[in-house]
Structures are given as C-alpha cells and as structure tokens.
C-alpha cells in the first residue's frame, strides 16, 4: 500500500521556528510534539490524519491555541494545526458566512463588519472560531441572538474511515443530523472529527452602546448582589459581565453591550447606579469598536482557569466565600468573572443541541496567573 505523505507547512524540533510553533496560550503545561503540520487546506488535514493512522502516531488538533489545559498539545506526537486556514466567504443574500477553521474571532469580526453583519461570539480576539463554537460560544450578544453554535447551518469535517483512511463529510439539519447535533455544544478537541469549515447565519449590526461601572472593594457584596439579580433578567438586548478583583486592586467592574441607544440604556442601569457610588462610562460606537472595547488582549502566560454555570442567584454565603478568597488572593492577577445568560440562550431546549446549560443564568470563570514556577501551587490549590 502506498503510504501517505504529510503536506502543508511542516515544523519539526530541529527547525528554528519550533519553539514558537509548539507553544499555546498557557505556558504552564509545556509539551514537545515531534511534528507540527500547519494545514493550508482540507486535503492537508486528510493527509495528516491518514499519516497518523498509517504510522500509529498519536495526534492532537489545534486552531486558536486557547485550550486552558493544553489538550491541543502532546509529547512525541503529531499536531494537526488548522490556524493557517482562514478564508471567510459572506453571502449577503442568504445572510450566511462560511468560515475556515483557522480563523480567530478578531479576523471573523473584522471580515463580517465589512458587510455590516456579525455572529454572537466571544470577546477575546485570539480565540479560534471552531473551539468556541463546538463548546457553545458565549459573548456580548448572547442574550439577544443566542450562542455561537445556535447560528450554525453546516459543518465541514474530516473523519477517519476504513483501516487508515480519511474522508470529508458535511453535517447539517438535513445531512448527518446526529453529528450536527453533537457539533453544537458537544465540545471541542476533535471529539467527532476535524472541522475544516463552519457555515453560520449572520445578523445585521450597526451601532451599539457600551458601558462600564466600577465600584471600590467596600461595595463588593452589594455590587455583586445588584448585578446578579439584574443582569440575567433585564432587556435581552443587554448582555453584561462582572469581574471581581483582589482586594489589593480595590475594584469591582461591570462591562456590557446594549443593542440600542445610550438614552435607552441609561434607565436600564438604574439598579446598578443606585448601588453604592460607582463610576460610569457609556458610549455609542460602531459595533467593531465595541469588539475592541471587550477584547482582553490575551498573551501567553502561566495560568489556571476553571468555570461553572450558575442556575440560581448565588446566596450571601457564596458571595462572602468569593470575597474571602479574593481578599487572600496569591497575587493581583487573580479574579472571578461572570457573564449574564438566559435571554435567547434559553429559547432552545436543552435537548435540541448538545449544549445542555440553557437555563443557566450566569457563566462563571475563576482566573489566576503567575510569573514564577514557585508561585504555581499557591495559585492552583
């Protein structure tokens, strides 16, 4: 049998660019793959999968390098990287966009903005579109339009077939519908194949209103209670987050986006404005400027992140536990972040897609990072 050759841009440990090619966003879990293939098209993906099967080489899939636990890396194996496949095609008549698997959110937002449309997706520009979508995908338009995966029309995916083969298939409501169900929130990492492109419904967008409110540490409990009793239930055009910072930073911050004018937004903020004495920022901007406002500008670092879904308002004791932790945080870079949900997210039943948490009112994430290895235990214990 004729053996398959790897195609695409191939990087091995002896190449000068190997160290840059192998690292992910999280530097605390380094891995040393033996080959990294930067696929240029879906045929390169097929060849990489065939090669791995023929040579019995373990492999991982990678796009945006945002796997928190570096599940997209491995030692002594093959990385099938699709990050250089970035083509985006917009159909303005049907209001759809077909996006190759390597595009990150920054690239997607900029391209779609040229056509006056967008998809509801995340806030970090460097996140890959595929990993986000397969996990569900939340962001500042979630309560108005739903999850990123809710906009999916079709998935193009490479799957293993036969003893050593690979094939390109499509999944939609009409074709391979069970696979399409699984791809909408069933998780990233290649659970069901290697996604090479996604087709989404897109939404017209123009100007939006952005805002932030900031309290001092003394208002920790009152500010969080006010936000969590307001954010999941307010006008669906408004999605917001609250980030709780360590005591040494003396800051609690709410940020949000409203698809409407500042004059409509201001009265909606009353429950927050009446809590303590927050500073307020409001502006009406083109949507692409709002994307920049929320982008956290992630850079590679050593970190640990985990999260949970909240189905009922967190009781006072729970808020006090968060306050206690952040008053004893290992450094100033720890935080607890929350985003409001429900709205359009719950318009789809939990069984209609693989994303189950339709009734969750809040997504919660625990964040910490460190500079030196000796600080690791204090940050992740």
Where are these regions (language model features)?
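Soluble FAD-dependent oxygen oxidases
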Residues: 1-381
């Amino acid at each position: 049998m004729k053996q398959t050759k790897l195609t695409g841009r191939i990087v091995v440990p002896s190449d000068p660019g190997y160290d840059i090619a192998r690292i992910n966003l999280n530097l605390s879990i380094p891995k040393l793959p033996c080959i990294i293939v930067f696929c240029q098209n879906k045929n390169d993906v097929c060849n990489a999968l065939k090669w791995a099967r023929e040579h019995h080489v373990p492999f991982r899939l990678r796009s945006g390098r945002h796997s928190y636990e570096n599940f997209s890396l491995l030692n002594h194996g093959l990385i099938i990287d699709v990050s250089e496949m970035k083509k985006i095609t917009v159909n303005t008549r049907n209001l759809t966009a077909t996006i190759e698997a390597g595009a990150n959110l920054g690239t997607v937002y900029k391209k779609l903005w040229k056509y006056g449309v967008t998809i509801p997706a995340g806030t970090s520009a460097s996140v890959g579109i595929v990993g986000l979508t397969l996990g569900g995908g939340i962001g500042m338009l979630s309560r108005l339009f739903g999850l990123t995966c809710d906009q999916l029309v079709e998935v193009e995916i490479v799957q293993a077939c036969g003893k050593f083969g690979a094939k390109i298939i499509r999944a939609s409501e009409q074709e391979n519908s069970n696979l399409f169900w699984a791809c909408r929130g069933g998780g990233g990492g290649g659970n069901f194949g290697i996604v090479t492109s996604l087709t989404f419904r897109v939404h017209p967008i123009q100007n939006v209103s952005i805002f932030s409110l900031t309290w001092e540490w003394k208002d920790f409990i009152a500010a969080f209670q006010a936000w969590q009793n307001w954010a999941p239930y307010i006008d669906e055009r408004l999605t917001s987050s609250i980030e709780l910072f360590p005591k040494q930073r003396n800051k609690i911050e709410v940020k949000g986006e409203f698809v409407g004018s500042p004059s409509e937004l201001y009265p909606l903020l009353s429950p927050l404005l009446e809590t303590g004495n927050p500073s307020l920022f409001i502006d009406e901007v083109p949507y692409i400027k709002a994307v920049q406002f929320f982008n956290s500008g992630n850079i590679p670092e050593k970190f640990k992140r985990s999260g949970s879904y909240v189905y009922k308002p967190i009781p006072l004791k729970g808020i006090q536990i968060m306050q206690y932790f952040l008053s004893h945080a290992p450094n100033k870079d720890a935080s607890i972040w929350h985003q409001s949900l429900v709205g359009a997210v719950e318009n789809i039943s939990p069984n209609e897609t693989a994303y189950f948490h339709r009734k969750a009112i809040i997504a919660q994430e625990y964040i910490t990072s460190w500079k030196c290895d000796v600080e690791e235990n204090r940050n992740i214990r």
